[in-house]
Amino acid sequence: MGNKNIKPSKENRLSILYKDRMDSFKRGSWATSSFREKSHATIQRFLSLRREHVKVDHPDKFLELKREIYAIIQKSSSIDVDKRTKLMSNIKTMMINPFMIEGLMTSLESLDPDNKMSYSSVMILGEFDIINISDNKAAFEFINSLLKSLLLLNTSQLKLLEYSISNDLLYTHINALEYIIKNTFNVPERQLILRCQYLTPIFSDLLKYAGLTIKSNILMWNKKFIKPVSDLYTSMQLLHCVTV
């Protein structure tokens, strides 16, 4: 007779059960491992996309502005200390008489390259010898950029900056404005608490004439102020570049 009805022994049943559980465990381990690998890959792709998204939609506006200013400042490298001193003296005179700036800038832009000296170059540059566009193009481009940056400011701002230069406050105001820019340019709106060191009367007025509002020690920021603040920061940096 066959042995179809013979039941496996207890030892055999335990062995079969153990084998089934091990097979199940291995399948589960593989599935878990596979899931982890897939999850890790998915997370990495997500983070990569997120980083790309941030780079595209949220560029560092302050860094871009600094790069633009640095490119302009590089053009001033040929202006030596004596010429910078004379240039700053004449620029300060124009800052308290803003009507002079536009006329002088127009004169520089239309200067004949064959003209070795002009009235405008004497007034702006002082003893700049035989400077002209072909001999010192970079210097002219820098001065034009400086004058244009000053033209974007109002009369009150120009007079405040002239006072800041005369009283060695310009660098302090640049640092204060950088603090504001770093904490505002990449957000549409914000209420920024200003430290006491940034709440000097002159600096507060510079911000006020740029359109910003300060309540107590809180700056009320809106992205519409990016342009006037950028203009102010650019002019301050270019002026500081000329100071000796």
From Swiss-Prot:
InterPro entries: Orthopox_A47. It comes from the Viruses. Belongs to the orthopoxvirus A47 protein family. This is Protein A47. It comes from Variola virus (isolate Human/India/Ind3/1967) (VARV).
